[in-house]
Amino acid sequence: MNSLVIQTTIVLVSVISVSIVHAGNIPAVIAFGDSILDTGNNNYLMTLTKVNFYPYGRDFVTRRATGRFGNGRIPTDLIAEGLGIKNIVPAYRSPFLEPNDILTGVSFASGGSGLDPMTARIQGVIWVPDQLNDFKAYIAKLNSITGDEEKTRSIISNAVFVISAGNNDIAITYFTNPIRNTRYTIFSYTDLMVSWTQSFIKELYNLGARKFAIMGTLPLGCLPGASNALGGLCLEPANAVARLFNRKLADEVNNLNSMLPGSRSIYVDMYNPLLELVKNPLRSGFISPTRPCCCAPAAPIPCLDASRYVFWDIAHPSEKAYQTIIPPIIQQIQQSFA
């Protein structure tokens, strides 16, 4: 019995060592935010904002729906793979987490969420700041696995924290909710969003995080949910608001670098790379720039080949679109944090 315990301990220690060494200076990818990074947390919530059913996930490695808002893998997975950490980033709320999942990173993101508490409340999902409660529990689990607070601190301080928030605040909460759009101008609301972002990053910093990759919003007016109302043309007012927020967010990222000693934050542009696919789809092998493959009134029957479509559904890019725009982001992360 004692021999079995000793052998198990040796194996666990070996797993920890391999995980830390394998990824070099970046041992883990940890994600927060919305459906761009949610790998299945909403499956375990009482919410209608979930996609744990066919045809979602049909091109995933298991050919099954996982709760990811797409036909296959999403940026969380692709970034972790590109950094040499692992191919799949599990959802923190999954009951099937293994020790190595904890060691190499998980996603706390919740599809439909945002920086504004009203955004999450409307959809019954996990508000971005409330995702920190799960992160605190994660730290305790991580510490129990490493058995060493210094190792735990090292993993957290060297992990890359990827954040995607703001898409739903603009597209859903501000544009459709008079409680917000009658009280705030779009200028004051985007200022508020940036302030919420700063507070969230500060909280993560206080919990030991030091490397932040902060994503801007997508070109919201080009999402099929908006563009299809104009016959496939991008809705410029929505894009203008996205650009406004992204400019302010990029400025705030620079402020964070001077505000938080020993940390490094980078702004990750999601807007322009996706807009390029919409404007010049054939250049990257796509045939449909704004018509989704699936799950829309105009496309009730899924397309045969999602890799030819920029968008999977009315709000989310296809796996192929992500595979096209994520490699430069991986390079940016490597150059900034490695």
Curated annotation (Swiss-Prot):
Gene Ontology CC = extracellular region
Residues annotated as signal peptide:
1-23
Sorted keywords for this record are: Hydrolase, Lipid degradation, Lipid metabolism, Secreted, Signal
The active site of this protein is located at: S35 (nucleophile), D313, H316
Q: Name one GO biological process term.
A: lipid catabolic process
| Protein's name according to its UniProt entry | GDSL esterase/lipase At5g63170
Q: What is its EC number?
A: 3.1.1.-
Q: Where in the cell is it found?
A: Secreted
User: Could you say which protein family the record assigns here?
Assistant: Belongs to the 'GDSL' lipolytic enzyme family.
Tagged with keyword Lipid metabolism: yes
> One GO molecular function term?
lipase activity
